[in-house]
């Protein structure tokens, strides 16, 4: 351990195994707060390497609680957050639309970081029980194509660093781990990053973690596809990485003028999303969700982005997505009821 610390303090990079050892200790509560603060600060100042981040991810994955992973193909869709845009929860709603289209989605979700409402906050507004048992979550996935795994329920190891991270009041390596810590370890994923410079880092981490196919994207300082400019993409397929750019026309849509789509509260976010999922939302919001669903369909092998977008728009405008959300909530509510009666 001493050699690992000396390397960090000398601004030298750890290899993947050294990082794994370090974060295994951190996730076990065996590093003091003052030492942890110095480690995180030193790593942040010199920048964290792909190998260091991969080692940290593997350490936390090895300590997570069990989830009954399915044999069939499934995906996650997640954003890093941290863009401070306070927009609606695009990835969460895209997951529901994708499930309504027939895709299997296991969404890893957490509490808000920099937005007015994180994925868990909005899910609770829709009465989605985030404390469902792993078995019930798996059953919901089998029958309704989607389930949500709440990070604090599956990852105990983060509790040992919470106080230090709060006190530091700055982004650290921890802020980048979430999208890679899905307890179901999916073979597919779509990840949005808040900074264009993070695309290459994220896609190479996915390669290190042996994802079958994945997309990392960024557009206009947000962690999602936008409709007023260029979306930058790196795609992992068969251990090879390709990079390309997309425009709204790539999805068969027209360019929208740039608009501020900020929401001011959880209640406002919920109301906007509810109307969209009922098929009564604004055209801009419908299309914004649809293009992100199109990318999710792509990792499942549906290569035509224009057709993918049409399919997603049809599902959104039909109102079927809201019915699907209600069905998921009702199924998980049964589990909640059973727990209260045991």
From Swiss-Prot:
Anthranilate 2 binds at residue 165. GO terms for cellular component: cytosol. Pathway: Amino-acid biosynthesis; L-tryptophan biosynthesis; L-tryptophan from chorismate: step 2/5. 5-phospho-alpha-D-ribose 1-diphosphate binds at residues 79, 82-83, 87, 89-92, 107-115, 119. GO terms for biological process: L-tryptophan biosynthetic process. Anthranilate 1 binds at residues 79, 110. Its cofactor is Mg(2+). It catalyses: N-(5-phospho-beta-D-ribosyl)anthranilate + diphosphate = 5-phospho-alpha-D-ribose 1-diphosphate + anthranilate. InterPro entries: Anthranilate_Pribosyl_Tfrase, Glycosyl_Trfase_fam3, Glycosyl_Trfase_fam3_N_dom, Glycosyl_Trfase_fam3_N_dom_sf, Nuc_phospho_transferase. One of its GO terms (molecular function) is anthranilate phosphoribosyltransferase activity. Mg(2+) 1 binds at residues 91, 224. HAMAP family: TrpD. This is Anthranilate phosphoribosyltransferase. The gene is trpD.
